[in-house]
Amino acid sequence: MNFLRKIVRNCKDEDDQKPPLVSAPPDDDDLWLPPPEYVPLTEITGKRNMRNFCINGEVKVCSPNGYSFRILRHILKSFDEIYSGNHRMIGLVKVVIGLALSGAPVPEGMNWVYKLRRTLIFQWAESRGPLDGEELEYSQEITWDDDSEFIGLQIRVSARQCHIQGRIWCINMNSRACQLWSDMSLKTQQSEEDKNSSLLLE
């Protein structure tokens, strides 16, 4: 077993900093409800504080015995406490992680890799969100480890403002992305300007 655990750690990128550990998930971790103020973004009519971002996102899951979304969701519930990137763009990062993990993974050795490359429309509430022209290069590794199981989560997100027409970032409330955003406590509010839009509060 110790030999296997040494092999497992080879599927992670070497890093001098020890990634944060997350505690074990509770048994009822699969119970969830979307945040009550969340409204799916459908068609934007208001233009205030709206920005298009060209996004490259990657979430790499490393686990020798497969993994369940119950554990991934449990890890992401601690995201606010362990996030190490630009806090003016934490809402954008949460959206990208949710969308990436909603796609199909590509196996890569002991890893499963989820990728997202898309232009997305974001709207922030007044005085929230990134500065004008601000870009993001975010990379972090998070691990969950106990005597029986190890999961490494490597997250990379790059974002730059661009003029390509963006897409909506939520299609229906029952999607896996919305479930993950609920887990990560994505902070939003309904737009006063457009009842079909959600403004990011982070």
UniProtKB/Swiss-Prot annotation:
Q: Which domain of life is it from?
A: Viruses
BP term (GO), one: viral budding via host ESCRT complex
| Function in brief | Plays a major role in assembly and budding of virion. Completely covers the ribonucleoprotein coil and keep it in condensed bullet-shaped form. Inhibits viral transcription and stimulates replication. Plays a major role in early induction of TRAIL-mediated apoptosis in infected neurons.
Write the signal peptide boundaries. none
This chain's source organism reads Australian bat lyssavirus (isolate Human/AUS/1998)
Name of protein: Matrix protein
Q: What is its main location?
A: virion
Compartments where located? Virion membrane; Host endomembrane system
Keyword match Phosphoprotein:
yes
Assembly and binders:
Homomultimer. Interacts with nucleoprotein and with the cytoplasmic domain of glycoprotein.
Q: Which keywords belong to this entry?
A: Host membrane, Host-virus interaction, Membrane, Phosphoprotein, Viral budding, Viral budding via the host ESCRT complexes, Viral envelope protein, Viral matrix protein, Viral release from host cell, Virion
> What segment(s) does the record annotate as region Essential for glycoprotein binding?
125-161
Q: Name one GO cellular component term.
A: host cell endomembrane system
Q: GO molecular-function annotation terms?
A: structural constituent of virion
A Pfam family of the record is Rhabdo_M2
**Any domain commentary?**
Late-budding domains (L domains) are short sequence motifs essential for viral particle budding. They recruit proteins of the host ESCRT machinery (Endosomal Sorting Complex Required for Transport) or ESCRT-associated proteins. Matrix protein contains one L domain: a PPXY motif which potentially interacts with the WW domain 3 of NEDD4 E3 ubiquitin ligase (Potential).
Please give the family membership noted in the entry.
Belongs to the lyssavirus matrix protein family.
List the InterPro entries hit by this protein, alphabetically: Rhabdo_M, Rhabdovirus_M_sf
Anything else known: Most abundant protein in the virion.
> Membrane topology per the record?
Peripheral membrane protein
